[in-house]
Regions:
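Hydrophobic faces of well-ordered beta-strands that scaffold small-molecule active sites
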Residues: 1, 72, 111-113
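Active-site-proximal helices and loops of the catalytic beta/alpha 8
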Residues: 1-64, 91-92, 101, 118-168, ...
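Loop/turn elements at helix/coil->beta-strand transitions in domains of secreted/extracellular proteins
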Residues: 66-70, 106-110
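Active-site clefts of carbohydrate-active enzymes
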Residues: 67-90
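Active-site phosphate/pyrophosphate- and oxyanion-stabilizing loops and adjacent acidic/basic residues
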Residues: 71, 99-100
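Conserved interdomain hinge at the start of the Helicase C-terminal
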Residues: 95-97
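Conserved beta-strand->loop/alpha-helix structural units within folded catalytic cores of enzymes
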Residues: 104-105, 116
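Surface beta-strand/loop "capping" patches
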Residues: 175-184
Length: 184
């Protein structure tokens, strides 16, 4: 489901539901997920590309019964990870912008395991590339990323950034329970 109208039909209270009303209060915002990778990779022109993709998409929230109840994410086990390869993990600016957007916009943010340590994976190579084990936790693991002191400098910066942002969000009711105001 890669357009908001198709997704909205599945949310409880949707005026677009075909037969009867679905009882799902929360649905996954796959259209937003598909835009996130592009939005933070492209230059934003005047009314096109880049972050305008997000602006334009959010302006269409009226199709949802409750946009605040959408599950929003940059990646999951059925998609390529936000970082599809090792080279992309070097761009922490892209990571910080995307994570900040996810944790401050409307909806219920979901972070896929490994995002905090910049795990990467390309779905086109197979499910195993996006569902790799988190490093650590087993005696045979050569690296234990459950302990922040075992992270490399880039992973540590990403980890501490997301931890700080999540702690800030936790203590900020307007971010977690407020509403989104869309301005032109």
């Amino acid at each position: 489901l890669n357009n908001n109208v198709a997704v909205s039909r599945w949310q409880k209270g949707s005026p677009l539901a075909r037969s009867g009303n679905p009882e799902l209060p929360t649905v996954m915002d796959f259209p937003l997920q598909s835009l996130i990778g592009h939005a933070f990779d492209e230059e934003t022109g005047e009314w096109e590309g880049g972050l305008f993709r997000l602006y334009d998409y959010l302006s269409q929230d009226a199709v949802y019964a409750n946009p605040m109840n959408l599950l929003i994410f940059a990646d999951n086990h059925d998609t390529s990870r936000f970082f599809q390869n090792e080279e992309q993990t070097k761009n922490l600016s892209r990571y910080k912008q995307a994570v900040t957007f996810l944790l401050t916009t409307r909806g219920i943010p979901q972070l896929y395991y490994g995002t905090e340590i910049l795990m990467n994976g390309d779905k086109s190579k197979g499910d195993g590339y996006v569902r790799k084990d988190f490093p650590g936790g087993w005696s045979e693991d050569s690296l234990n990323c459950f302990s922040p002191e075992n992270l490399n400098a880039t992973q540590a910066e990403a980890f501490h950034f997301i931890r700080k942002l999540l702690n800030w969000r936790k203590g900020n009711e307007a971010i977690g329970k407020g509403s989104l105001k869309h301005f032109i």
